[in-house]
């Protein structure tokens, strides 16, 4: 029930990664990356399926060898989302996966080789209608740029990116997006701000090597939150030393917090104190796990007492306000006659949320069908 995001997004051109539109106002796509051995086809496909279940839009797969490229051919046949091939050092691997139907090629300017090699990659991409991501990283800048600046700086990342933008422009190839990632929040933010002023191509956001699940999520939320709040960014990846599924969840949570893209339940819950009348923390944790399959956007407030409970419930799709024995229940901001038994809160609230989601989905379906008439 909260208002739409006030953020005005940066104008950018449109490309397609498989069937996913990127840029020019398209929904910001959430990406992740497999961390299996790509030559282990079964494990890699299993992980991609796990990412698909939590709503990933695009998955990147590392292709370090020709054996991995051959495995990618089998992986691509079993994936339901677009796959990006992550290519370093050997440009010939990019040429091979282009033959196997890759949806996007990620190349690193710092190690892909000279312009002649890039020309071959671009020729293959053009022939197969495959977009390219220029993936600049503060940890692998070209040697001459490292010597010029002494250390990674926003200007150094920008120079690396623009050097390869110029090559693609000379080759009359405009189907590309760019990233300028760094592990330092301020370095990455500064580089993206500079790049956003220079080009109109879509930007892929990320804080690279952000860290473990907790610290990495915080760093990514700060860095990407700053950029997204300024309208910068068309795709994103949360880089965590953790299960890639967590990357997708955190990515959607950041977009949800900024009201840029809503997917699933936005839980509004109090941190609890001695005034709580039911187990708020246990209720929220259980419902987050049980309702992971729901994609319907809605705000659900779960507040343990009447201090802030009614106010939050009045601006939520569904809301619970703690009271002794039985708690108040709100729907669309209106208090209902029915009250929820505190002893059975989780099951009751799950049923209410699923019923509301079904109703909202049906209303949306009817609205779409009427527009089609």
UniProtKB/Swiss-Prot annotation:
Record-level GO BP terms: isopentenyl diphosphate biosynthetic process, methylerythritol 4-phosphate pathway; terpenoid biosynthetic process
Catalysed conversion reaction: (2E)-4-hydroxy-3-methylbut-2-enyl diphosphate + oxidized [flavodoxin] + H2O + 2 H(+) = 2-C-methyl-D-erythritol 2,4-cyclic diphosphate + reduced [flavodoxin]
This protein's UniProt keywords: 4Fe-4S, Iron, Iron-sulfur, Isoprene biosynthesis, Metal-binding, Oxidoreductase
Cofactor annotation comment: Binds 1 [4Fe-4S] cluster.
Coiled-coil stretches noted in the UniProt entry, renumbered to this chain: none
Record: residues binding [4Fe-4S] cluster: 270, 273, 305, 312
Record field: transmembrane: none
The protein's required cofactors: [4Fe-4S] cluster
Documented EC number(s): 1.17.7.3
GO molecular function (one): 4 iron, 4 sulfur cluster binding
Biochemical pathway: Isoprenoid biosynthesis; isopentenyl diphosphate biosynthesis via DXP pathway; isopentenyl diphosphate from 1-deoxy-D-xylulose 5-phosphate: step 5/6
Protein role: Converts 2C-methyl-D-erythritol 2,4-cyclodiphosphate (ME-2,4cPP) into 1-hydroxy-2-methyl-2-(E)-butenyl 4-diphosphate.
Family to which this protein belongs: Belongs to the IspG family.
NCBIfam families to which the protein is assigned, alphabetical: ispG_gcpE (TIGR00612), PRK00366.1 (NF001540)
Protein name, entry field: 4-hydroxy-3-methylbut-2-en-1-yl diphosphate synthase (flavodoxin)
Organism: Photorhabdus laumondii subsp. laumondii (strain DSM 15139 / CIP 105565 / TT01)
